[in-house]
């Protein structure tokens, strides 16, 4: 059973819903499994807790 953990800046629920639907379709197709076997968790991380290129984002 695939488990996808996505950490990202906070996004609206509509965005997470669309991502979950599309990612589930892709995983199901390529792994030849039914949609209910794909798990996705979204973890919102505030910008001030991210660093990219050595610079804090918040």
Q: What is the meaning of each model-derived region?
A:
Residues 2-58:
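A domain-level signal for the structural core that forms small-molecule/cofactor-binding pockets
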